[in-house]
Amino acid sequence: MTLNSDYLNLLDLMQITNANFPIGTFSHSFGVETYIRKDIVFDGESLIKALLLYMNEQLLHGDLLAIYQIFKLLPKQKINAIWEIDQMINFQGLARETREGQRRIGQQMVKIYNELFNCELLVEYAERIKNKKSYGNPAVAFALLAMHLKIDLKTALYTHLYSTVAALTQNCVRAIPLGQVKGQKIIYQLKHVYFDDIVNKVFTLDFKTDFCKNIPGLEIAQMEHEDTPVRLFMS
């Protein structure tokens, strides 16, 4: 007896967004470690503020808007425009560690996705990365697989938002430290209070003017992290 394909797709989605999925997210704080080192982030409330800053700026205008755009482009077979998103999101990253971290995570996602699933566009993506025509990006890889699994846009946005924030929260909880139960409470609060607002914002954005918009403070923290002599994270 085999499972219904809809359930299988859901389980596949749960597998690839699990915190234990080996794509290297446990190695990155995306600048939050700088805030921790400066005692700007030191407890649960200050961590929530930092996570909201990341979610409402880089994650919203970067990953989530990229996923939204790819869901619009792929049904129209505008494949080259999807590869352009990979290049744009890479070039817009000013902080070297964060840019390279996203690239490594994206490349690892493409590699493992291709070992698990039979998706022609992900195979093409891997070839483009190998031939240095594309860089590799988590949002691009995830959007391609989500569409392959017939996941609807809103589910894809919520899932990517959750998996990214959950991984980052767990990393920060280790660094402060706060304890795993406190980390789970933070994730629960973010889901129930803020996720709807962030996902709904995606549908109000204009790709041409809003893609990769960011605020200086977060990128400065990410760039300062490059000169941190003792650190827990690669970014």
UniProtKB/Swiss-Prot annotation:
One GO molecular-function annotation for this sequence? nickel cation binding
Question: Where does the UniProt entry say this protein principally localizes?
Answer: cytoplasm
Q: Which Pfam families match?
A: UreF
Top-level taxon of origin: Bacteria
User: What Gene3D superfamilies would the database entry show?
Assistant: Urease accessory protein UreF (1.10.4190.10)
Q: Which UniProt keywords apply?
A: Chaperone, Cytoplasm, Nickel insertion
Say if the entry is tagged with keyword Chaperone.
yes
Q: Which InterPro entries match?
A: UreF (IPR002639), UreF_sf (IPR038277)
One GO cellular component, as annotated: cytoplasm
Name where it's found: Cytoplasm
Name the protein family. Belongs to the UreF family.
Assembly = UreD, UreF and UreG form a complex that acts as a GTP-hydrolysis-dependent molecular chaperone, activating the urease apoprotein by helping to assemble the nickel containing metallocenter of UreC. The UreE protein probably delivers the nickel.
Q: What is this protein called?
A: Urease accessory protein UreF
Name the species this protein comes from. Ureaplasma parvum serovar 3 (strain ATCC 700970)
Q: Write the gene name.
A: ureF
